[in-house]
Amino acid sequence: MEEVTVYKISDRAKLPYKQTSYSAGYDLYSAYDYVIEPMNKELIKTDIILKIPNGYYGRIAPRSGLAYNYFIDVGAGVIDSDYRGNVGVLLFNFGSTQFNVCKGDRIAQIIFEKIAYPKIIEVTTLEEINITDRGNSGFGSTGLK
């Protein structure tokens, strides 16, 4: 990927920014002030529109400091290459106190990832998907420690 084009909808918008040369994610910033009550959610607008190259998408991920210190998490975090709207970040407050988001705060990070577009083929028998030794064992089946 060579470049992602960014359009700022308002003067409140900030360009995504990589804090270090080898950071995987680019910080995203709130364009407005918000209050997120405990055990609630808010859609935080960034006031940016992205043009992500075909073959890539943007994955919205939490900022570790917000998650660790304030119990703030991110949901619904996929920005497709053909999306051309205001990038919003769904923040969940799993903490016991309200969380204030101020204009200009770093709220999440976007990681640009390569994507595959496989053809989906329906089969009519279970044998056609090659059953493995693991089978349908999931959620802790390979050990908890």
Swiss-Prot record:
GO terms for molecular function: dUTP diphosphatase activity; magnesium ion binding. It holds the Pfam family dUTPase. Its EC number is 3.6.1.23. The keyword Hydrolase applies. Keywords: Hydrolase, Magnesium, Metal-binding, Nucleotide metabolism. It catalyses: dUTP + H2O = dUMP + diphosphate + H(+). SUPFAM superfamilies: dUTPase-like (SSF51283). Its cofactor is Mg(2+). GO terms for biological process: dUMP biosynthetic process; dUTP catabolic process. It is an enzyme of class 3 (hydrolase). Transmembrane segments: none annotated. CDD domains: trimeric_dUTPase (cd07557). This enzyme is involved in nucleotide metabolism: it produces dUMP, the immediate precursor of thymidine nucleotides and it decreases the intracellular concentration of dUTP so that uracil cannot be incorporated into DNA. Belongs to the dUTPase family. NCBIfam families: dut, PRK00601.1. This is Deoxyuridine 5'-triphosphate nucleotidohydrolase. It comes from Fowlpox virus (strain NVSL). The gene is DUT.
